[in-house]
Amino acid sequence: MDLPVGKRIKHYRDRAGMSRPVLAGLLGKSAEWLKAVETGRIQTPRLPMLLRIAQALELDDLADLTGNGHAVPVSVYAGPRHAALSEVQAALTEYRVTRVTAAPASVPHLAERLRMAWLVRHSSSDHRTQLGSLLPGLIRDAQATARALRGEQRRAARVVLSGVYQLADFYVAYQPSPELVWMVADRALTEAQEADDPYAMAGGSWAMVQALRDAGRWDEAITLATDARDLLLPYLDTAPDDWRGMAGALDAEIAYVHARRGRHGDAWAHWEAAERTAQRLGADYRHTQTSFSRSVMQAHAVTLGVELRRTGEARRAANALDPGLIPSLARRGRHLIEVARIHAQEGDGPGTLALLDRAQRVASETISFNGYARDMLIDLHKRPPAGEREAVRDLVGRVGLAIA
């Protein structure tokens, strides 16, 4: 089949019996965008989007879309499917419409279970496995309780349910079911809106901003993050510290989006606003959902430098931060991957390998599901540093990357 990429996408979409709006929805794009891709009116999507299209169309070989004649297993680039994903997905998609007859769970008890689940998430190297065992029951119980209660109790239950979806967002991210990312982010925000709780709405918005950002919907991400931050502003003088932490985290997200689109001045302006908030909150403060803190703001500075391709700025920020000051193992692992990206941009293979090895030892299930880490490992496997071929193979094996 000698066809351009756009026509190949249309061929496999038609073969799957999938309409253009349905596929576009799974990708977080508009039907008009997909039509432009299929007809060749806009340039071919980049690799991350091609992978998402291949996954949505249930293709095992990326060459079905690229047409280069060489097998390119989607699983190598797209990452693994966690063993518990089906169970979490089942809990999310059990649409129960019959009346709840069982006694609802205690809302304070649900809130405590959620608090403990967050603690597990931040303190475990295998955080996805731990969440995979906790989330199905927590999702079902929180959903049933929110349906069974009335009045103010239902509002309180919906706040907890929004928080459960915010936690689930970390589990479903970077797995081969992108529709679940949109589902949990939308539900987190919707439940918070139904509860009329500004703080929960900001938390749901923070989750949705991640999805919008990764879909390249920059303006929507910035608008939502700005609106959510502004929603909190009238309360900050008297609200708990977490409200200020959430506002700071939203500023940090705006900075990240600007960096992703290459806007240096805007990125650093919002980073500085978030940094001022972190400084006011003190050295011991850390926001549970977003990990917002002084140490993580320094980690954000590394990421801004990397995204803006200013490795000198990124390296200075990295040198100013002891990774051990980041309490969350998952977030610490991500930071080490970002430092590895500095070395990769500089063509430093041994440095890249050393940082990725550290990241794997800190949080094995962060690196296994991180696309940047996967790409760097694939490059290292193709061109290992001198004398490090076996070390690369060992790390690839520990990460679980299926490279022939």
Stretches with model-predicted labels:
Residues 9, 20-24, 34-38, 65:
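Conserved hydrophobic/aromatic packing and binding residues within compact polymer-binding modules
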Residues 13, 24, 54:
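The alpha-helix within a helix-turn-helix
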Residues 28, 48-64:
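DNA major-groove recognition helix of helix-turn-helix/homeodomain DNA-binding modules
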Residues 28-44, 70:
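Recognition helix of helix-turn-helix/homeodomain-like DNA-binding domains
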Residues 67-93:
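Short, charged recognition helix plus adjacent turn
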